[in-house]
Amino acid sequence: MKLNLANPIVFFDLETTGINIAKDRIVEISVLKVYPNGKEEQKTIRVNPGMHIPEEASAIHGIYDEDVKDAPMFKHIARELAHYIEGCDLGGYNSNRFDIPLLAEEFLRAEVDFDMSKRKFVDVQTIFHKMEQRTLSAAYHFYCDKCLSLIHI
């Protein structure tokens, strides 16, 4: 992947116990770190959330209590993760509204400093919404690769 980067960027995705940023916890973190020279590193880390994973969440991501019972809790990997993404910009899908705030909450609970002031954030969902029209015709074309002609009688 060739990107014009001033800093490394970490694209990441979280799997969680739910969608409440203040209450829910991370059960898996997947990251793709891209360096300005094009080098890439990938990691996936399972995390014991210290709470039951609701069936509704497990039905979405396929991770159950049994899968994370021996995984480290976030507080045990927080410093290493913070060091790994130090100096990196962050990117993801819906990351500005969900993943980044939830990750920041987890760092706060673990009492690990996570400075966001010098980072850039790339939310691919925001870019997609700005680039694609929000119409039935545009959605049909995007997903079906066909033109939809709407005839009003």
For each of these PLM feature ranges, what is it?
Residues 121-135:
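Short alpha-helix plus adjacent loop in nuclease-associated cores
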Residues 1-118, 133-147:
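Conserved non-catalytic scaffold segment of RNase H-like nuclease domains
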Residues 151-153:
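Conserved small/polar residues in nucleotide/adenosyl-binding loops
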